[in-house]
């Protein structure tokens, strides 16, 4: 596996953790974060959502930043969390919640809303009178999960905790990094990260798009192919073990 030289594009803190795991496996990596996370100020409406947390039969946490920021709110308002189902769309997010002491339901395979919806344990949590679900996430984002749940008669509320933005890099920075460090693979962890990669590449995309591109889900894989990426590898998850398994298979 030591032949891989990867560009990591997650937010700073996540890049550092992933780089450490890859380094232990003998994989060289270089970090160029393509997503920055800015926490949002709490509004009175959001405070009310947290104070009413015990109204929800399930809380869905969609990302690691949402988990970290959501737990800060939970600690502030609920020293003893109410009894309800906590869910995440991936193992890495679940690990943050579990470290806090929560029991978490999450899909073993796949880091997306589709995989969560297919979980019997999640569907079981909705079989109550007047089911309500709170989704902790970033500002904006996919509506798929909420739409599907509302189609099942579930009331869905959002708790936006952060805003994503693309860091500023000079034109040509991406290709210059790839060439200077002889990188032979790219890793993205979300659809927005992929879009930011594509926009940063700009006129260099034809060359960048020829590199193997490791993505976390079938949805992001399809997005990458639509953008013209020539070799897309679906890791079926955004965790380090999922990426390492995909690297072994793709070698």
UniProtKB/Swiss-Prot annotation:
> EC number(s) for this protein?
4.2.1.75
What reaction(s) does this enzyme catalyze?
Answer: hydroxymethylbilane = uroporphyrinogen III + H2O
Q: What is this protein called?
A: Uroporphyrinogen-III synthase
Pathway(s): Porphyrin-containing compound metabolism; protoporphyrin-IX biosynthesis; coproporphyrinogen-III from 5-aminolevulinate: step 3/4
RNA-binding found in the keyword field:
no
Q: What does this protein do?
A: Catalyzes cyclization of the linear tetrapyrrole, hydroxymethylbilane, to the macrocyclic uroporphyrinogen III.
Protein source organism = Pseudomonas aeruginosa (strain ATCC 15692 / DSM 22644 / CIP 104116 / JCM 14847 / LMG 12228 / 1C / PRS 101 / PAO1)
Keywords annotated in UniProt: Lyase, Porphyrin biosynthesis
Identify the enzyme class. lyase
Q: Which Pfam families match?
A: HEM4
Record keyword Lyase present: yes
Q: What is the lineage of its organism?
A: Bacteria, Pseudomonadati, Pseudomonadota, Gammaproteobacteria, Pseudomonadales
NCBIfam families, per this entry? Answer: PRK05752.1 (NF004395)
Describe the protein's quaternary organization and the partners it interacts with.
Answer: Monomer.
The family line of this record is: Belongs to the uroporphyrinogen-III synthase family.
Which superkingdom heads the taxonomic lineage of this protein's source?
Answer: Bacteria
Record-linked SUPFAM superfamilies? HemD-like
A single GO BP annotation from the record?
A: protoporphyrinogen IX biosynthetic process
One Gene Ontology molecular-function label: uroporphyrinogen-III synthase activity
């Amino acid at each position: 596996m030591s032949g891989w030289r990867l560009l990591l594009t997650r937010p700073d803190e996540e890049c550092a953790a992933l780089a450490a795991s890859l380094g232990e496996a003998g994989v060289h990596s270089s970090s160029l974060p393509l997503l920055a996370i800015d926490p949002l100020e709490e509004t009175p409406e959001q405070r009310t959502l947290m104070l009413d947390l015990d109204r929800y039969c399930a809380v869905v946490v969609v990302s690691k930043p949402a988990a970290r920021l959501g737990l800060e709110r939970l600690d502030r308002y609920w020293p003893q969390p109410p009894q309800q189902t906590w869910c995440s769309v991936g193992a890495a997010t679940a690990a943050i919640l579990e470290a806090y002491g929560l029991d978490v339901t999450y899909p073993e395979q796949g880091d997306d809303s589709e995989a969560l919806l297919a979980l019997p344990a999640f569907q079981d949590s909705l079989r109550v009178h007047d089911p309500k679900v709170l989704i902790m996430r970033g500002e904006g984002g996919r509506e798929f999960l909420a739409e599907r749940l509302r189609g099942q008669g579930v009331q869905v509320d959002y708790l936006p905790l952060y805003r994503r933005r693309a860091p500023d890099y000079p034109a040509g920075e991406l290709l210059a990094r790839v060439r200077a460090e002889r990188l032979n693979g790219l890793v993205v962890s979300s659809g927005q990260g992929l879009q930011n990669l594509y926009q940063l590449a700009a006129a260099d995309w034809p060359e960048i798009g020829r590199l193997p591109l490791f993505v976390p889900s079938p949805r992001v894989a399809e997005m990458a192919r639509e953008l013209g990426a020539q070799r897309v590898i679906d890791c079926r998850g955004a965790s380090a073990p999922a990426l390492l398994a995909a690297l072994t298979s793709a070698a």
